[in-house]
Amino acid sequence: MAMNKDKPWTLYLLAVGLAVLAAVQFGLFSQPAVQAIPYSQFLQLLDQQKVSDLHIEHERILGRLQEPIDGHSVFSTVRVDPALSEQLGRSGVAFSGVVEDNTVATVMGALMPLLMLLALWYFLFHGLGQKQGLGGLMGVGKSRARVYVEHDTQVTFADVAGIDDVKGELTEIVSFLKNKAWYARLGAHVPKGTLLVGPPGTGKTLVAKAIAGEAAVPFFSISGSEFVEMFVGVGAARVRDLFDQARQAAPCIIFIDELDALGKMRGVGSFGGNDEKEQTLNQLLAELDGFDPREGVVLLAATNRPEVLDPALLRAGRFDRQILIDRPDRKGRLAILKVHLHKIIYKNDLDCERIAEITPGLTGADLANLVNEAAIVATRRSSQWVELQDFTAAVERLVAGIERKGSVLRSDERQVVAYHEMGHALAASSLPAMDPVHKVSIIPRAAGSLGYTLQRPTDDRYLISTQMLRDRLVVLMAGRAAEHLVFGQVSTGAADDLGRATDIARQLVTRFGMSPVLGQAVLERQQAGYLGDSLLRQERKDYSEQTAREIDLAVRGLLEEAYGRARALLEQRRDDLDAGARLLLAKETITPEEFPALQPQANEPATYVLVDATK
């Protein structure tokens, strides 16, 4: 701490010194105004005894007058007469002479550029480095891990909800850190490394902090991207320093977040023969082999891209254990909601079970954001507490985007959108395999949609049948089918529906083996690439041109079948379609309670006719 307090004074003194040197170098010291006079005038002043004192240099004379002339009391002139001293003596004028010495000025002129460069180097590599926590140029090889102790993490297993099945695995790590002797009596030791795998936002970092908080041990937290800097060898040096610090603080936990930034498969995407990231990874592998798990150092790491990690990093003896932290189920979402609800003021009869039901697929981070959004919605309407309607509005905002109530559609466009959305809603309510309809709206959203039909599942699904996929195609095609049925033509409003339907149909044929024509072969596989998520999913096609043609025909057949089913269903329910569209135009948003025809009912026609909607 003393060093930190002295740093401002050090920088202050350095700045003052530089200012002084600059003043000397560039002559910034102020001097009195000097009047240059001819040597003959100087001799006259000397004879008239108007000169008080003189300073004689090698080539010039500086003097001061007894009385100022023209506002100047100091004068200078060129030294001409070598016998000047005799005349000065006769006149009784005191004078002095010096031999001009330019040694100091010469030396300072030579050193000034060097001193300026040294000062610039100091500020760049020391002052800036301290602000960024680098410790200066000499400290670039030091670990940048943030160290927490028990009271710093402020997180325990009580703050981690929705992953009860994972807590059992993690409790073993806490038990080892608290009681190593109990495991050592049978020769057991904790796994060297534990890899937390899961989608973003599922709580991997929170779990690591909870382990440290439960075990009450130091917690070294660092991101995988913080190891590599612009200097070669810095990453490897930081890995060594991190493990050295951990050994000194044992028992402790090292947590490396975003391990894929550091442990990416070697040779993939490397354009140099000796890549800096590979050096850092090699040093990490060496440290994992070198430290003894009985020392009490536990290594935790987290990633959402395990497929790109180097196989050498995942072998036994390094990361021995992988723990999947997946999206929570309904029970898990309920537990997570209860944790975050303590941070807001909500109505006592708030139905948390209902909120958990309408939020399938949301992660812990999503649910935390949902609770905050609901509180914002309640504040916006000046409510005293947060209610279920606020959570419903927050879910719609997350799913469909922000309402654009200022957008004004033409009357004919609103009518097309109303029939389009009612077509989706009636198709979903007529097919038992589909999720029930919760709300239909023709209010434009920021996500780019002019309307939306919101369906909410009643439970989590882990398997999807062929019938469910085919029915989903019917719901997607029903919007365009309604437009064609009512107006005799179609619009561009179904572009997104057609794209999603085509993707489902293609996966049904090529990935799921559900095509009666092509059989149960998997024709396309997804491979992991090196570049980001947009290019991460690369399709590998293992089929001939003839098979490609058959795939295209099969996909087209599925879409035509779905469109025919949707058209037949809406023809049978034409009265409901017209009534629902009129109500939607009047109210803009309706629910099954306001329009009972949206309640689930299995009444799909047994037969249908294929219709060409492009004409």
Swiss-Prot record:
Family: In the central section; belongs to the AAA ATPase family. In the C-terminal section; belongs to the peptidase M41 family.
Catalytic residue list: E421
Cofactor(s) listed in the protein's UniProt record: Zn(2+)
InterPro entries xrefs: AAA+_ATPase, AAA_lid_3, ATPase_AAA_core, ATPase_AAA_CS, FtsH, P-loop_NTPase, Pept_M41_FtsH_extracell, Peptidase_M41
Record GO biological process: protein catabolic process; proteolysis
Source organism per UniProt: Pseudomonas putida (strain ATCC 700007 / DSM 6899 / JCM 31910 / BCRC 17059 / LMG 24140 / F1)
Record membrane topology: Multi-pass membrane protein
UniProt cofactor note: Binds 1 zinc ion per subunit.
UniProt cross-references to Gene3D superfamilies, sorted A to Z: 1.10.8.60, 3.30.720.210, P-loop containing nucleotide triphosphate hydrolases (3.40.50.300), Peptidase M41 (1.20.58.760)
Topological domains annotated Cytoplasmic: 1-8, 126-615
Residue ranges annotated as Periplasmic topological domain: 30-104
Binding site for ATP: G198, P199, P200, G201, T202, G203, K204, T205
Stated name of the protein: ATP-dependent zinc metalloprotease FtsH
